[in-house]
Amino acid sequence: MLLAPWWCLLAMVVRCATQRAEPTACDDDACRCDSFTRLICHCTDDYKELTLRPDGAYRIPPTATAIIIDGCDRLIFLPDTVRNLIHLRLVEIRNVSHVVVNERSLAWNPFSRDSETNPGLRILIHNSTVNEISSYAVQGRVDDIVISDSRINVLRPFAFSSLTGVKTIELTNNIFDNIEIQSFKKFTTNNFILRGGRASTLPSRFLSDVEVTNLFRVEGVSIKHLSSLTFLVNLPKRILVESNSIDTLDGDGFHISSRGPITFRNNTVATVRNGAFLGFTADVEVVSLMGRQELLIDNNTITMLSPSSLTYNTTSLLLRLDGLNLNMTCTCQLADEWRGVLSEQGGIINCWYELEGHYVSIPTYLDTRCGAFKNTFWIFVVVGVFVIMVAAAIAIYFILRRENEKKKKLQIVMPDGKTYRETEFHIVVERAELLTTDL
């Protein structure tokens, strides 16, 4: 009987504590938490803006395993939003009109010991407009970063930095308005893929001190200016730069040490600066064990290119030119400029043959248009045509003159001999005088 008051008192304390408990994001009108402790937010017309915070009222609950946001007009991540969410594995953002990712808001490494065996975070952004990804916004233990079909207004320095255990970074069909230097800084990933979309300028050190252990790929991207030292990358097994449209490719734009072959294929480039391929090298250990690696330049169309633009690292690489289309009109002078490259490297280099309206290999053009006689061939043709025209004009002149002389001769019509057998004709030429009024 004495214990009854204590149980009543304890129940009252628990009830009061429950009443005083602050609401979490699960209690937000636009959000809910499911049985898997995932925070799922789908904004409506009444609740268009959402702010995710680490503490205080409507904070993300510490048991959250995923944060899934869809259809909001505006989403803001405050600093340290996910830092202490030890159970978190996924951050997914879809169809959001304005996203702001503040400093350290997606910095996540809740484990006391830094180890790649610890589970990591997966970050997905799809079909959204990201106003800004601040410096140091994404750090720590991250498995994958996938951003697709989105627009990024501002990407600050060190936005993605000091990451561990990264498997894949994939940027697909995005529009980058303003990228600042060293946006991706100092981490290791298995794969880095930049595919589709467009960027006004990829600045120097866009990727800085990044180690890619498997695949480095840039494919189908429209780039106005790819600056010098844009990609500072080490040790990928495979490098593929394919089907891109680049206005200007600066020298040493790809500063990459590879452990395997390098392919630069099906790209359209307006201007290639000197030394554009000089930054490609092969790792010293790989060269010592397997020999020089291949640098394949295959089926590219380039408007402004000089032989010095194809300078490469001969110590660690072997260059293979297979279908380089120079978007320039074929001339014997152009062919002479590339004669040395062809004799040294071999391969197929084409120029635009206007007379026939297609690309033709430089050796073929040399053989057909640039011999000792062929250089003066058109001069002979022009002179021959001129001589023929003059001869024709002279011939026409004499023919017309002869015809005119025939017309001036007197013509007499003789009567039939049967009728006028004894008729004599006397032709008297009289001088005609002017008539006077005396007649």
Question: Predicted segment positions?
Answer:
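Extracellular leucine-rich repeat
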Residues: L2-L439
